[in-house]
């Protein structure tokens, strides 16, 4: 497999494995993926240009890669707390946590959530309007940001 490319593998109805398909790209990070609706999913990766790029599956076909911007490093993480909502988090070149979100009809601009991370973030949604993001801080501590549907809180 060529370095810096994305691949997918799927099973046919009989359970037999098929070959990996290249989805292209110039990946510099591990991809992150989330689903925001039935038969819909979106994959994200930081490319060699330092920007986040995404590509989505609509249930029938993969759409082309789309640049989402940012000045990022490391590996992104993504989650969804409801239909037509996607949240993506990544560590910026400044060490801060950066957030990008989609909903309901368009991508919103990147926002810095601050902090100084020394690891890639991990995010999870445990209900509608609920997201928790974790990362390692400068002193080896666990940083935590939580969204309650209205505001971010930090611990």
Q: Where do the PLM segments sit?
A:
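A structural motif
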Residues: 1-155
């Amino acid at each position: 497999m060529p370095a810096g490319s994305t691949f997918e593998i799927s099973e046919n109805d009989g359970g037999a494995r098929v070959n990996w398909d290249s989805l292209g790209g110039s990946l510099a990070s591990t991809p992150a993926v989330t689903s925001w609706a039935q038969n819909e999913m979106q994959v994200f990766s930081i490319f060699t240009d330092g920007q986040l790029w995404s590509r989505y599956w609509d249930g029938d076909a993969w759409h082309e890669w789309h640049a989402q911007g940012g000045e990022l490093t490391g590996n992104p993480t993504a989650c969804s707390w409801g239909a037509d909502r996607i949240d993506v988090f990544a560590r910026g070149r400044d060490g801060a946590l950066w957030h990008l979100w989609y909903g309901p009809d368009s991508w919103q601009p990147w926002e810095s959530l601050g902090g100084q991370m020394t690891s890639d973030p991990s995010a999870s949604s445990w209900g509608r309007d609920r997201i928790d993001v974790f990362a390692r801080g400068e002193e080896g501590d666990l940083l935590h940001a939580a969204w309650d549907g209205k505001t971010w809180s930090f611990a």
